[in-house]
Amino acid sequence: FGSGGVFRITMQNLNDRLASYLDKVRALEQANGELEVKIRDWYQKIVLQIDNARTKFETEQALRVLDELTLARKNHEEEISALRADTERQNQEYQQLMDIKLEQEIATYR
């Protein structure tokens, strides 16, 4: 072979190894790109899940507040109804007393 043949074989060997390394680098870069896409997709999915959980929590809170307000409104309506009934009763008593007073005044003048 001679020194030129050994040099050429060594260079060919180094070129083959370099080509192999470059192929590995390209494959790793491609795999890295695919992983980045998967990570980005996973992150977006998690963000959506968090947003959905937040929305669900806020909706549940709003429904709780709505239930509390509905109950409070019902209680107020019952109180108003009781007050109306009491007012009507007092009005009737007042009217009866006024009728009695009127009858007494008429009786006084007879």
From Swiss-Prot:
One of its GO terms (molecular function) is structural molecule activity. Residues 9-42 are annotated as: Coil 1A. Residues 43-45 are annotated as: Linker 1. The modification Phosphoserine is found at S3. Residues 85-110 are annotated as: Necessary for interaction with PNN. Residues 85-110 are annotated as: Coil 2. Residues 7-110 form the IF rod domain. Signal peptide: none annotated. GO terms for cellular component: intermediate filament. This keratin differs from all other IF proteins in lacking the C-terminal tail domain. There are two types of cytoskeletal and microfibrillar keratin: I (acidic; 40-55 kDa) and II (neutral to basic; 56-70 kDa). Belongs to the intermediate filament family. This is Keratin, type I cytoskeletal 19.
